[in-house]
Every structure is written in C-alpha cells, then in structure tokens.
Amino acid sequence: MPVTCTNYKLKCGGCPLLNQPYPDQLKHKQQLEQRLLGRFAPVSPVLGQAEPWHYRNKAIATFATGPRGRLTCGIYAAGTHRVLPYTDCLLQDTVINQTIAAVLEAARACRWPAFEEDRGTGLLRHVLVRRGKTSGQVLVVLVTAQENLPGSRNFVKALREKAPWVTSVVQNCNPRRTSAVLGSDVRTLYGPGKITDTLCGLQFAISPRSFYQVNPEQTEVLYAKAIEFAALTGKETVIDAYCGIGTIGLCAAGRAKQVIGVERNPDAVRNACANAAANKINNARFICADATDWMRAAAQPNSGLPHPDVVFLDPPREGSTPACIDAVAAMKPKRVVYVSCNPETLARDLTHLTRRGWKALKIQPVDMFPHTEHVETVVLLSHKKADSYIHIDVEFGEGE
C-alpha cells in the first residue's frame, strides 16, 4: 500500500516503518527478537496481522495554538514539541479519527484556548478517545489544565451534534507541569464515564485511566497464546501480576481453580472486580497493591496465601523489578508466562530469571503494533531441575 499519510512526510514519528512492505516489517521484528532473545529459547515466527490498518482503539491528540491564533490539535513531530495538525491517521480506528475532528470543532465553538506549556497558561491540554471494537461505544476524555471548564454543557451538546456516536464525555484535570497526559481528577460530563468492549468472549469495562491493549484483534491472538502456554487444567492457582483491568486473569479463570490479580491502579482494580461480576466469574479476586510489594509478601513462608501453580507477568515497558522476579523464583510455580511489550527489558528480566534457576522454553512474538518498531512477546518458562544448574552467590570482603 503506498504511503498517503501527510504527517508521515512531516516526520510525525507515529509509524516509522510505514514505508516498508508489511512482510519486511515482520522480518525486521523477527531479527530484533532473535538478536535479543534467541539465546534463551527458539523464537517462533512473528504472528502478523491480516489487515494491519486502522487497528488502534485509542488515540491521544495534543491541543496547540495554530496559525492566526486558531485552536488546533494533533500529534508531536518526532523529537519536537511542534504539533502537527491531526489528519486521518492510518493506524487509528476511523471513527476515532472522526471523533477527534468533532472534538476540535466543538472546542473551537466554545472558544477555549490551548494550554501553553512554556507559560503555564491556557486550558486545553489533550483529548483522549477510546472506542470499543465490538460495542462501538466511544469515550472522549478532555484533559484540561484547570478544574473550571466554562461552557462544558455547550461543548457536550456541540460534540454530540457532530459525533452522535459518542457515548461518554469525561473531563480529566491535569494542572501539573509534566509530560504525563492524564491527571488524577476525573469528572463525568456525559454518559457513564466509561465504555465496555468484548475480548476473548468476555465483557470488559474500560475507564479513562485504565490500561487496555490498543489492538483488540491481535490482543486475542496474544492472550490465546498466553493461555496456551499456561497449560491450565482447572486445578491451578494462578497469579496475574500487573493485571490491569483483569483481562488475562479473567480469560484464564474459566480454565483454572482460582485467579488472584494484582494491580496498583485503583481505577483498574475497580474495573477488574466489575468485569469479574459482569462475566459471572466467581473464582477470581483482585488486589490493589504494587506488584513487587505484594509478590514479595506473598513469597514469604507464612504469608497464608495459596501456592501458585502458574504466574502471569505482564509489566509495563520498563519491565518487572529484580525484587518481583526474586519473589516469583522463590514461589517456584510450575510455569511462568511472561508477556512483554519491550524485548530489551524482557531480555534483562529473562537473564535474571535464568540466574534464579528458570529456563525459557518457548518464545512467541506477536505484532501488536504494525508500522512501528514495537513488538509484543509471550515467553513460557519453567524451573530447571535441581541437578541441572548451579547457582552461586559470591560475596567479597575487604581486601579480596
């Protein structure tokens, strides 16, 4: 497919591989995985997407002051703070593209100014849009620099006239000088303040600040592979660390004895509990805690928690922590299934797990982000036999 994206030529940076044929992109990612992870286990061929366009169910656009002082919104040019006006992105869901255009028109009608980062003045910072792939529900999150939002009712009315498919509108206040998009304060302006979507046959509620995979089609491929690697028989206790809104854990619950999910984001934990109830899943519970802290406590001999047979690890891009990995190693589950969106931090964590007596058996890359450098990976690990490895801790005293 020839490149027809205007912003690609303007160096938006959102899809650096757009000019490469898709098979070549997959080859590039395969080579990356092999280089970083091939020493741990055989790397299976990357699972690509049949139609790798308009796959993203979430978009974030930044407001700025455009020519002649007119409000605009778009994406940053690569390596700059220059906002490129938003056009029809080839990666975003087409309804999301249309929604962002409608948000801009409605905001202009309200005469709201863009937030000026250098001066700390203005109102509008970002707009975040989510769309449920199966439900069609659309959530608009307007990120502002202050709580006061004059004319918010007029904005909702104008937006609904231009985009009647929008089902929820939320204001998120982020007054801090920060590169983080979302703040902590949320106010619902219209609708339930969240959307629902169906994934792997289950219904999930998704709130503004909750993590949810951006490519639903490939997410089902990813989770199916993770569940396959877990080899559940219905008798296992499963820990789902970094569980988010409970997607992996709830997908596993129907094949396990019990699931314990751990997540530090309170909104995500509330969503996870609601998702379990909505799907009538009674053998899963979710705990609001830092994954490392909770895993360390659970690994203690007198923790009172059931011994896990399977542990899912699905950390953010920075990977897990040495303390969390040590806790997993101490628990000695039968299997660990590590889901990673960053092969570099995955390689680091696999090195740590290997030193702690674990062995990677299978590595399966999944192309969750076509036309970008990113790739998702699922790894199956099991504990080495006691006589198959030697682990030695050496401490040196003074003068040694």
Which residues does each predicted region cover?
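Extended interfacial segments that mediate partner engagement and assembly in macromolecular machines
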Residues: 2, 13-116, 129, 134, ...
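Short cysteine clusters
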Residues: 5-7, 12-15, 341
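Nucleotide donor/acceptor-binding cores
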Residues: 57, 136-138, 235-236
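Solvent-exposed residues in well-ordered beta-strands and their adjoining turns
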Residues: 62-64, 130, 143-145, 382-384, ...
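Short, acidic/hydrophobic/Gly-rich beta-strand patch recurrent on exposed beta strands
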Residues: 74-77, 141-143, 272
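Short helix/loop segment immediately N-terminal to the Walker
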Residues: 113-121, 238
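Short, aliphatic-rich beta-strand segments
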Residues: 129, 135-145, 203-207, 310
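Rossmann-like S-adenosyl-L-methionine
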Residues: 151-400
